[in-house]
Every structure is written in C-alpha cells, then in structure tokens.
C-alpha cells in the first residue's frame, strides 16, 4: 500500500502543488510583462479557488459516474496542457485557472478515495497528502531564470505532465471505492467545522497568492514550505489516526493559528 500511496502522491504534487500553489511564483512575472495589477492577479487566484470549490462539491457525482480511476487519471493528465496554455494571455488564463481548480479538486479527492479503498492507513494518507509538498519543492526549480510568463506556465505544465506519467504504474493496482452511503441528516453537527475550514481557506489562499511579492528569496521560502508539507503529512497521518479526526483537525488548526 505504501508504494501505491507514493505513486498516487504525484497527483497532489501536480494538482494542488504545481497547479494551484506554484501559481504564487508567477504573478511577479505577469505583473512585469503583462502589466497585471494586484487586483487582476487576485482575480486569477479567485477563479482557481472557485473552480476548486465547485470541483470538490461535484467530485462525488462526477467521479462516481465516470469512475474514480478514470476521473483521477483523466484530470491528472489534463493538468499539463491546461497549465501550459495558461500563459497565452490574461483572459484565457482566467478561464484556465478555473478549469485547473476543478481538475485539481478531482485529483485530490479522487486519489484519496482510491487510496482509502485499499484500506484505512493514516501513514499512507499522510504520504499521499504530503505530495503537495513535492510540487512546492519542484516549482522554484522549474522556473529558474524564467523571465516570460508563457515560458513559466509551459514549464509548470511540463512538470505536471511528467508527474502524471509517474502515477500510471499504480493504475492496475487500484480498485473502485464502494458507493457512498446516503444519509438523511442535516449539516448542523458540522456547520461550525465548515465555517472554520472556510475561514482557514480564505486566509491561506490570499497568503499563497501574494507571498512572493513580499518575500525576496521565494525559492528558499517554497523550499521550506515544500519540505514542511512533504514530511509533516507523515506525522499528521498517524497522529490523526491515533487521536481521531475531530481532535486531529483541532490540533492542526491550532498550530496554524500560532
């Protein structure tokens, strides 16, 4: 299971890692070459966030209909072309950032569901989620010495495409998750959790969009973020398995607050 988790981890590396968070490396180039304002750069981030939100909401329906394996690998292999075409201009970028958000959500949710179908393992899930850190680590190296946004997006697309190919050996080893059990309850018990998670998302999206404009050595910053995301997943997975999901989430959010 560990080997399959590591192979599937290339999904979060390509989707949320390179496709979503590495976007923060590109706004300075787009501002210099395209003349983008902070508001326009923020709209690109908002389009991506909206796409991710709608992709996450639609994941059970879409992935359940087409199959989790087809949905995961299809979205993963589309990451490369979508990212590569993002550098063609502002209006295409606005649409493609939305599309990438949808695809990134299907990758993240689909891969986790496929991994959980093999058996519940906090360590394996931690390794899978840590794949985001690999994308953060690769982003600065892919963009070394790049001065043109089109070249930057092409390199990110190439990196995402390579990561997608890396996940292919796991395909014959995976099985479809069982159909979800439909409940009749309301959202009352989890409403506070949804608000907390929404506020957390609103905070870190703004931070990850504009952090490179405030920090000079963004390669070092993303390296530290990548290492942290890559290895803390291996810690948090077993910890949440030990203390339970509710307490584990409280512990994670408390440390983020500090």
Name every feature range the model reports, one short phrase each:
Residues 246-258:
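C-terminal transmembrane helical hairpin of 12-TM major facilitator-type secondary transporters
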Residues 57-58, 128-149:
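A gly/Pro-rich, aromatic-decorated transmembrane alpha-helix motif that marks the paired
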Residues 54-87:
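Conserved MFS/SLC helix-loop-helix module at the cytosolic interface between two early adjacent transmembrane helices
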Residues 11-30, 207-212:
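Extracytoplasmic
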Residues 23-24, 190-223, 229:
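Extracytoplasmic gate region of multi-pass secondary transporters
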Residues 46-60, 223-235:
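Central cavity-lining transmembrane alpha-helices of secondary-active solute carriers
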Residues 96-131:
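Cytoplasmic helix-loop-helix junction between adjacent transmembrane helices
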Residues 153-172:
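Symmetry-related core transmembrane helices of the 12-TM Major Facilitator Superfamily/SLC fold
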């Amino acid at each position: 299971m560990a080997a399959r988790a590591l192979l599937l981890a290339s999904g979060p590396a390509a989707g949320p890692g390179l496709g979503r968070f590495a976007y923060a490396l590109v706004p300075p180039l787009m501002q210099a070459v395209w003349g983008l304002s902070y508001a326009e750069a923020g709209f690109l981030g908002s389009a991506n966030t909206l796409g991710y939100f709608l992709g996450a909401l639609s994941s059970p329906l879409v992935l359940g209909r087409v199959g989790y394996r087809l949905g995961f690998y299809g979205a993963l292999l589309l990451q490369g072309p979508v990212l590569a075409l993002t550098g063609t201009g502002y209006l295409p970028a606005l649409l493609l950032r939305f599309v990438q958000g949808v695809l990134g959500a299907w990758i993240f949710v689909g891969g986790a569901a496929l991994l959980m179908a093999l058996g519940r393992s906090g360590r394996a899930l931690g390794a899978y989620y840590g794949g985001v850190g690999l994308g953060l680590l690769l982003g600065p190296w892919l963009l070394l010495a790049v001065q043109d946004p089109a070249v930057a997006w092409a390199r990110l697309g190439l990196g995402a495409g390579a990561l997608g190919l890396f996940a292919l050996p796991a395909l014959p080893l995976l099985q479809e998750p069982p159909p979800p059990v439909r409940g009749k309850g309301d959202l009352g018990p989890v409403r506070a959790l949804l608000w907390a998670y929404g506020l957390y998302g609103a905070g870190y999206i703004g931070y990850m969009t504009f952090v490179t404009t405030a920090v000079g050595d963004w390669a070092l910053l993303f390296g530290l973020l990548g290492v942290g995301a890559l290895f803390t997943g291996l810690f948090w997975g077993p910890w949440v398995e030990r203390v339970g999901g509710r307490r584990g989430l409280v512990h994670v959010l408390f440390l983020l607050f500090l």
